[in-house]
């Protein structure tokens, strides 16, 4: 195992009983990330954690390669949890819970083993969650506001919205990634930058326009509209959306 089985993080916070993860997570790929099918409004405790790990890791990185790395990390965690000496409380943890249970050295070793980069940020994230006072990490991930999520090291405008958009059916937000900025320019929206705006005021203004534009495409959810738009642009097609059209025209 990656560390000796000492007191887990929730015990350090004063919780005497673990409600972490309501089921064992077998080696069946159920927690694995598929970047083309990332949306999950009914995620289990374990799945919401793997979705969050991917959201943090993929910022500024290729999605397919990052998904492979995160899935490798999930495999490493599951192997540790299946160790003959692992107690049930370890086996029941979701992936983020397990990583937060580790001390900082074995934690960062697991991150480095999968070459996820941003190691200082990951370590700050580990410290942030270990200082967090909440009954469970899944509860936090399912209920935290965008503003609260943005307090986590490594989670800014795009990451917070990417995670919320694809994990909550009632989300009214969108990450202003490259594909969305191109999408807005192709719709004739003026003054759209080539990169995600650093100004919060500019971000919120463009986000409001993007939300309405994505809704006009006629997909069942905002997350679906975002994902399909990303697929179109990442496949190398240039899209031209005429005002009022319910579906994109590929030219």
Residues of each region from the PLM?
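C-terminal accessory module of base-excision DNA glycosylases/AP lyases that mediates lesion recognition
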Residues: 1-45, 118-128, 134, 138-251
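Alpha-helical ds-nucleic-acid-binding substructure associated with the helix-hairpin-helix region
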Residues: 75-153
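Short, flexible active-site loops
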Residues: 53-54, 105-111, 144, 160-166
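Structure-specific DNA junction-binding interface
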Residues: 1-93, 97-110
């Amino acid at each position: 195992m990656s560390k000796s089985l000492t007191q887990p993080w929730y015990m350090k916070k004063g919780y005497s009983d673990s409600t972490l993860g309501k089921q064992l997570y077998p080696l069946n790929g159920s927690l694995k990330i598929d970047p083309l099918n990332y949306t999950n409004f009914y995620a289990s405790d374990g799945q919401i954690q793997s979705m969050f790990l991917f959201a943090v890791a993929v910022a500024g990185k290729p999605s397919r390669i990052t998904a492979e790395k995160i899935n490798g990390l999930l495999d490493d965690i599951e192997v540790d949890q299946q160790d003959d000496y692992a107690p049930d409380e370890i086996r029941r943890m979701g992936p983020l819970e397990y990583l937060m249970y580790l001390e900082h050295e074995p934690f960062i070793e697991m991150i480095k083993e999968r070459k996820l980069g941003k190691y200082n940020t990951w370590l700050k994230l580990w410290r942030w969650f270990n200082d967090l006072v909440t009954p469970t990490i899944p509860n936090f991930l399912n209920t935290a506001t965008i503003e609260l999520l943005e307090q986590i090291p490594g989670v800014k405008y795009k990451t917070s919205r990417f995670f919320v958009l694809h994990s909550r059916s009632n989300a009214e937000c969108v990450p202003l990634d490259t594909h969305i900025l191109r999408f807005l320019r192709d719709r004739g929206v003026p003054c759209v930058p080539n990169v995600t705006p650093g100004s919060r005021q500019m971000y919120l203004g463009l986000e409001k326009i993007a939300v309405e534009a994505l809704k006009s495409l006629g997909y069942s959810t905002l997350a679906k509209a975002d994902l399909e738009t990303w697929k179109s642009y990442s496949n190398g097609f240039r899209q031209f959306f005429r005002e009022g059209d319910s579906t994109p025209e590929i030219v």
